[in-house]
Amino acid sequence: MTRLALLLVLALIAVPAAASDWGGIEPGVTTVDQVRDRYGRPSKETRPKIEGYDTLQWVYEGDQAPAGIARMTVDFGLLTAGGYKPNLVRLLTLEPKPFMFGKSTVIQGWGVPDAVADNKDGTSTYIWKDGLLAHFDKEGKDSTSLILSVPQPLVPSAPPAAPKK
């Protein structure tokens, strides 16, 4: 394990992190330019159209990925109350190398999850309402991916009441 990766793990253990922030990237706040300034040019860039909006996806792999991460994917383009913001981070997906983000490390870093789902394939997903989804392997010990987004409600809000007559 490299020294930087070890420091990263220790930092996560020592201080609880906001689920929607990792490695200087916070969905809904961080811009394309800020990601480029911090991580450089991506290994791969695509421009998918999602729900009619032009979006941007950057993938950092191999030597371009942060220490301890096999692949980091940053999706840009966020629909906000103020309109569509093509330069804001929508999602950050981390695919850690084995043993980088074990279940206890994730819980120590982000706290107790708000919900847990057991998947049909034997894996599990831990969900934090402030924007983190952590997928764990069949043994339930090692994370296979961490997906960070803007905070999400666990239960959809009720539709507004019909106007009174």
Q: What role is predicted for each listed range?
A:
Residues 14-16:
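N-terminal signal peptide c-region/cleavage motif recognized by signal peptidases
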Residues 1-8:
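Sec-dependent signal peptide recognition
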Residues 30-165:
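A cross-family detector of function-defining hotspots
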Residues 5, 20-21, 91-92:
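Residues at structural and domain junctions
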